[in-house]
Amino acid sequence: MTLIMHSSLLLIFFILVYPLLTTLNPNQQDSNMAGMTKTAVSSAFFVSLLPLMIFLNLKTEGIITNWQWMNTQAFDVNISFKFDHYSLIFVPIALYVTWSILEFALWYMHSDPNIDRFFKYLLTFLVAMIILVTANNMFQLFIGWEGVGIMSFLLIGWWHGRADANTAALQAVIYNRVGDIGLIMTMAWLAMNLNSWEIQQIFALSKNFDMTIPLMGLALAATGKSAQFGLHPWLPVAMEGPTPVSALLHSSTMVVAGIFLLIRLHPRMENNQLALTTCLCLGALTSLFTATCALTQNDIKKIVAFSTSSQLGLMMVTIGLNQPQLAFLHICTHAFFKAMLFLCSGSIIHSLNDEQDIRKMGGLFNIMPATSTYFTIGSLALTGTPFLAGFFSKDAIIEALNTSYLNAWALTLTLIATSFTAVYSFRLVYFVIMGTPRFLPLSPINENNPLVINTIKRLAWGSIIAGLIITQNFPPMKTPIMTMSITLKMAALMVTIAGLLVAMELANLTSKQVKITPMISTHHFSNMLGFYPMIIHRLIPKLKLTLGQSAATQLDKTWLETVGPKGLALTQMAMAKITNDITRGMIKTYLTIFLLTLILATIPVLL
C-alpha cells in the first residue's frame, strides 16, 4: 500500500513539474503555459484521490525514504515522505482548490502580458506546499516552508509598477523572516541535542529533554507564517496582489503552513503547558483583534483577509486546547469557503471596473445572481451556519473550548471573536448584495463566463458538503464530550445570532457616503487597525530616528567640537597667548624672565 501511495505522490510531482520543465526550452513557440498548468493540476487532483481512497479503506499510514541526501557519522539527512491522514487529506484539498483558482485566473488575468509566468509562479508555489505537507523531516519541511515564502513575495508584488504592491511584498517577506528565525533556531537546537531532523526520531529521542525552547521557536515560526498577533500586519496588506493569489496563498494554503507545522510536531507539544498556553492565548488574542479590525473596513478584500487571520487565530486556539485534529479539520473546511469568498470578490471587483469599496456596491443580487448566491453561501459557512462546511469544525472547536476547563479569558475572547465573525460577514453581504446599486451604471457587468461560474460552483459544493464528508471519514483522536448542557451546546449558534443582530445595527451606523475619515469616534480603533501599524511602522522608526539624531548631535557637538578640536584649540590659544606676550617688546617682561633665569641658574651653584 505504501508503494501505491509513494508512486502516486511521485506521479503528482511529475505532472506538476512537467509544465515548469517545458518553459526551460529557449525556442518554444506560442506556449500555452496557463492552460497546461490548469490541466496538470486537475490531473494531479484525480491521481491524489487514489492514495486517499486506499487510506480511508485500510487506515494504514506509511513512511518511505527514497534517497540519502547527506550522511555523516552522527547525522543523516534523507528525502523522506510521510503518508498519514494529514498529508493524504490535505494534498487533494490543496489540488482541488488550486485547480478552481487557476481556472478562475485564466479569466481574471487574461489581459496580463505575463500570464504564463504568473501561472508558473502559482505552480511552483503549489509544488513547494506539497513538499511541506508530505515532508517527514525538518530539512525537507524547511525547503517547502521557504519555497512558499519566496513565491508569496513574488506573487504579492506581481504588479511591481505600483509602490503599494512592492511595499506589501517586502512587508510580507520581512515579517515571515522574523518567524523563520524561530524555525531555524529550533532546527539548530534539534541538530545539536538530538542529532536528527527525522520527525519520528525527534519524538522518540526528545522524551528526556526540556522542549520549551524549541517549542517556543516553533510557536514564533507559526506566528510569522500564519499571521498571529504581533506579526499579523502583512496579511491584510498582501491583498495588493492579484485576487487569485489572495485566494490561493492567503486563504487556503500558505497561511495555514504555520498551523500545519504545529500539528505535525504536536506530540512533543501536548505535554508542555507553557507552549499550549502560549498558543491558546495568542490564538484568542489574534482572533478577537483581527475580527475587530474587520468590523468597519470598507475594502472587500481586506475584510475577507482579516477574517482569514481571525480563523487562523481560532486554529491556534485549537492547538492550545490539545486538539490538533480539530485544527486540521478547520484548515480543510476553511480552504473551500475562504477561497470561494475571494473568487466571488474578484468577480465582483472585475465587473465593477476594479472597485473594491463596498460602499460603492449594492444591489448585486439582481445583476450577478450566481456570484451573489455563492458569496452568501461562503459567508454563511464562515459564520458557522448549521450543516455547512464551517459548522462541523467551528462548532466542534467551540464545544471543545467550552468543556476544556482551561483559560476562561481565552474562551471569552474566542466567543466574542466568533460573534464578530457573524457581524462583519453579514455586514459584507448587506453592503455588497442587498439594497440598491450605488455604482456607476456604465460598469460592464457580465458573470456568464464558464471560467468564473464553474470554478466558484465547484468551491460552493465543497463549502456545503466538505465538512460532512471529512467528519464521516476522519474520526477524532479523542472522544468528544457526550454530556453537555444545552447552553454550552448552543453557545456558538447563539453568539452567531447575536452577531447578526449587531451587524444590522452596524450597517445602519456606517455612512454610505464615501468619507476619508470616519465620523463615528467608536470606529477609529477598528479603522486604524488597532493603531498597530502606526505604532510599529511609524512610531518606533520615528523614535529611533529621533534618538539617533540626538545621539549624533551630542556626539558632534560634545566630542567633535567642545572636547575635540575646540577644546584643544582653547588650550593651545591660552599657551600661545603666554608665549605671544614674550615677543611684544615689553622691557619689564624681558627683565623678569632674565632675573628668573639668573636665579634658576645660580641656585645649583650655591647649593
Curated annotation (Swiss-Prot):
It catalyses: a ubiquinone + NADH + 5 H(+)(in) = a ubiquinol + NAD(+) + 4 H(+)(out). It holds the Pfam family Proton_antipo_M. GO terms for cellular component: mitochondrial inner membrane. Disulfide bonds: none annotated. The keyword Amino-acid biosynthesis does not apply. The keyword Nuclease does not apply. It is found in: Mitochondrion inner membrane. It is a multi-pass membrane protein. Keywords: Electron transport, Membrane, Mitochondrion, Mitochondrion inner membrane, NAD, Respiratory chain, Translocase, Transmembrane, Transmembrane helix, Transport, Ubiquinone. The chain crosses the membrane at residues 1-21, 44-64, 88-108, 118-138, 139-159, 172-192, 213-235, 243-263, 274-294, 303-323, 326-346, 372-392, 415-435, 450-470, 484-504, 587-607. InterPro entries: NADH_DH_su5_C, NADHpl_OxRdtase_5_subgr, ND/Mrp_TM, NU5C-like, Proton_antipo_N. Its EC number is 7.1.1.2. GO terms for biological process: ATP synthesis coupled electron transport; electron transport coupled proton transport. GO terms for molecular function: NADH dehydrogenase (ubiquinone) activity. Its main location: mitochondrion. Belongs to the complex I subunit 5 family. Core subunit of the mitochondrial membrane respiratory chain NADH dehydrogenase (Complex I) that is believed to belong to the minimal assembly required for catalysis. Complex I functions in the transfer of electrons from NADH to the respiratory chain. The immediate electron acceptor for the enzyme is believed to be ubiquinone. This is NADH-ubiquinone oxidoreductase chain 5. It comes from Cyprinus carpio (Common carp). The gene is MT-ND5.
